[in-house]
């Protein structure tokens, strides 16, 4: 079986509001797919259901053929995501943030991974700064490093370029 994400007849309602209505798509390994649409059309809700953070009203999400609702723990260790709605701990340094997330994912070569990501994302001069003192764009680069720390097989991005400069 190839690695894939399959969204099947996925819907989500909040009381009387239909946030996502019966969507279907498949993303195969090494594909990059964007969900496009106006504000409030259900993109973030769809990502939440794909991660197993929100329960669909109907339909399902399969990750490599496994239902996310029934296999959250095993599947979430292979996934990661970025969202501008999730705050970084403000009193931790950039390095401490990356160490915490690396340990959560049992990254074996953690210091090497931190060094690599800090260079790639231009964070090396910020590693000892507390995240509460960073600009929005710098925080987004830390969030990206955090999301890549475990080399996820699935990376879901919700508004990943918000506040980033063109070089990033």
Residue spans of the language-model regions?
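Conserved catalytic motifs of ABC-family nucleotide-binding domains
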Residues: 151
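Conserved ABC transporter NBD signature motif
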Residues: 59-70, 75
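Conserved ABC ATPase signature
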Residues: 130-134
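Helix N-cap at the start of a conserved alpha-helix in ABC-type nucleotide-binding domains
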Residues: 166-168
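Conserved ABC ATPase "signature" region
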Residues: 99, 103-126
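Catalytic Walker B motif of ABC-type/P-loop ATPase nucleotide-binding domains
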Residues: 155-158
């Amino acid at each position: 079986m190839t690695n894939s994400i399959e969204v099947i007849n996925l819907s989500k309602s909040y009381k009387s509001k239909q946030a996502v209505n019966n969507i279907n798509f498949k993303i195969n390994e090494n594909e990059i797919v964007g969900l496009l649409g106006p504000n409030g059309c259900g993109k973030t809700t769809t990502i939440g259901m794909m991660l197993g953070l929100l329960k669909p009203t109907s339909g399902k999400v399969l990750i490599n053929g496994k239902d996310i609702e029934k296999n959250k723990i095993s599947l979430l260790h292979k996934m990661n995501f970025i969202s501008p709605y999730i705050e970084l701990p403000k009193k931790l340094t950039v390095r401490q943030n990356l160490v915490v997330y690396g340990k959560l994912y049992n990254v074996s070569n953690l210091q090497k991974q931190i060094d690599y990501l800090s260079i790639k994302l231009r964070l090396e001069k910020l590693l000892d700064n507390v995240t509460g003192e960073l600009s929005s764009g710098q925080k987004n680069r830390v969030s990206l490093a955090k999301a890549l720390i475990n080399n996820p097989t699935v990376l879901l991005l919700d508004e990943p370029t918000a506040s980033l400069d063109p070089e990033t």
